[in-house]
């Protein structure tokens, strides 16, 4: 029955997305909700200008429908269900607002950094409050051991850092056709298997709803992309994967399962610090680091496949660490 639920959750999210995206693309084109390409980005990306964005509206809707249906079918809706709903829906709503400002008000950068950060912090605090008053353990698991460290009130700081950090990390990674879609399929599949192994069916259902939605979206988002997810999708996926890692108490494994997100973010931080310290010199040709490889002559598809491969290796190792 449990396996049937997971397959059904995956299938419903996949089917809704596959049907919904082709119907949504003409609607976005009619409204002129097209992607703006930043002037400082790689020149080869200029041809992407005008590609419909905010496609995440479809797959987030599909995921939530599938997730909530099978959560209710499975019995009592748990606190974990609502925590995951908060992460996906509210981070998605923040991203939607950011996208809306970009495409409708023609402000290429969307929300200001301060506005986006305050929104992320507010959502993370709400997540912590629900988590705290639901009597979840406020501990961190030490990798490769059975030791858990009780953080007490410092746990709220960790929640803020983790949710805000990974929502931004996935957002930074979303710069190539299909990159984040494929990495999300890999990462949430890994966490879905871990949650199933731990008998946390609510979390497993959530993960496989996302896998189904993302595989459906990838059909249209792979190179050359017919539609982009926008910040609506990247912020929602980043916040969600951080939330899942907390609920299965495998927070540090996210650094391995989401290794590409970590590398992309680290490349930006290193570039900024080095640029300031050397007054204008750079480590990479351009960051996030996927642009470094593009400017080095790699095709977009080659970069994406390589990064997917690295993400897959990290995910397989992580699942083996937990199960074996």
Curated annotation (Swiss-Prot):
Organism ancestry: Bacteria, Bacillati, Bacillota, Bacilli, Bacillales
Major location category of this protein: membrane
Transmembrane stretches, start-end: 9-29, 54-74, 77-97, 117-137, 147-167, 176-196, 201-221, 227-247, 253-273, 304-324
Enzyme class: transferase
Organism: Listeria welshimeri serovar 6b (strain ATCC 35897 / DSM 20650 / CCUG 15529 / CIP 8149 / NCTC 11857 / SLCC 5334 / V8)
Protein function: Catalyzes the initial step of the lipid cycle reactions in the biosynthesis of the cell wall peptidoglycan: transfers peptidoglycan precursor phospho-MurNAc-pentapeptide from UDP-MurNAc-pentapeptide onto the lipid carrier undecaprenyl phosphate, yielding undecaprenyl-pyrophosphoryl-MurNAc-pentapeptide, known as lipid I.
Protein name: Phospho-N-acetylmuramoyl-pentapeptide-transferase
Molecular function as annotated in GO: metal ion binding; phospho-N-acetylmuramoyl-pentapeptide-transferase activity; UDP-N-acetylmuramoyl-L-alanyl-D-glutamyl-meso-2,6-diaminopimelyl-D-alanyl-D-alanine:undecaprenyl-phosphate transferase activity
Pfam families with a match to the protein in the record: Glycos_transf_4
GO cellular component assignments: plasma membrane
Annotated gene: mraY
Protein's cellular compartments: Cell membrane
Membrane topology reported for the UniProt record: Multi-pass membrane protein
Catalysed reactions, as listed in the record: UDP-N-acetyl-alpha-D-muramoyl-L-alanyl-gamma-D-glutamyl-meso-2,6-diaminopimeloyl-D-alanyl-D-alanine + di-trans,octa-cis-undecaprenyl phosphate = di-trans,octa-cis-undecaprenyl diphospho-N-acetyl-alpha-D-muramoyl-L-alanyl-D-glutamyl-meso-2,6-diaminopimeloyl-D-alanyl-D-alanine + UMP
Presence of the UniProt keyword Cell division in the record: yes
GO biological process terms on file: cell division; cell wall organization; peptidoglycan biosynthetic process; regulation of cell shape
The protein's Enzyme Commission number: 2.7.8.13
UniProt signal peptide: none
InterPro entries cross-referenced by the UniProt entry: Glycosyl_transferase_4, PNAcMuramoyl-5peptid_Trfase, PNAcMuramoyl-5peptid_Trfase_CS
Cofactor: Mg(2+)
Biochemical pathway: Cell wall biogenesis; peptidoglycan biosynthesis
Keywords in alphabetical order: Cell cycle, Cell division, Cell membrane, Cell shape, Cell wall biogenesis/degradation, Magnesium, Membrane, Metal-binding, Peptidoglycan synthesis, Transferase, Transmembrane, Transmembrane helix
Family: Belongs to the glycosyltransferase 4 family. MraY subfamily.
């Amino acid at each position: 029955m449990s396996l049937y639920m997971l397959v059904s959750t995956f299938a419903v999210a996949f089917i809704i997305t596959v049907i919904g995206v082709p119907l949504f693309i003409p609607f976005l084109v009619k409204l002129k909700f097209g992607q703006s390409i930043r002037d400082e980005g790689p020149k080869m990306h200029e041809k992407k200008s005008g590609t419909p964005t905010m496609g995440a509206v479809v797959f987030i809707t599909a995921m939530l429908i599938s997730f909530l249906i099978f959560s209710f079918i499975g019995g009592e809706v748990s606190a974990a269900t609502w925590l995951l709903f908060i992460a996906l829906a509210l981070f998605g709503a923040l991203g939607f607002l950011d996208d809306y400002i970009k495409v409708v008000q023609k402000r290429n950068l969307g929300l200001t950094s301060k506005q986006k950060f305050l929104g992320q912090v507010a959502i993370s605090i709400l997540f912590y409050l629900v988590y705290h008053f639901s009597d979840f353990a406020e501990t961190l698991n030490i990798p490769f051991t059975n030791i858990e460290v009780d953080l007490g009130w410092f746990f709220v700081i960790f929640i803020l850092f983790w949710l805000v950090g990974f929502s931004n990390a996935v957002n930074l990674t979303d710069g190539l056709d299909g990159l984040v879609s494929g990495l999300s399929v890999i990462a949430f599949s890994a966490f879905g298997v871990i949650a199933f192994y731990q008998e946390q069916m609510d979390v497993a259902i959530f993960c496989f709803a996302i896998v189904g939605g993302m595989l459906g979206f990838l059909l249209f988002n792979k190179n050359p992309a017919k539609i982009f997810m926008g910040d609506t999708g990247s912020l929602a996926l980043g916040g969600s994967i951080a939330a899942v890692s907390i609920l299965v108490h495998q927070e540090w494994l996210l650094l391995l399962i989401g290794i590409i997100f970590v590398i992309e973010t680290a490349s930006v931080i290193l570039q900024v610090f080095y640029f300031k310290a050397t007054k204008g010199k750079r480590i990479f040709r351009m960051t996030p680091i996927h642009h470094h490889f593009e400017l080095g002559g790699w095709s977009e598809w080659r970069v994406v496949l390589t990064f997917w491969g690295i993400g897959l290796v990290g995910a397989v190792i992580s699942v083996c660490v937990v199960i074996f």
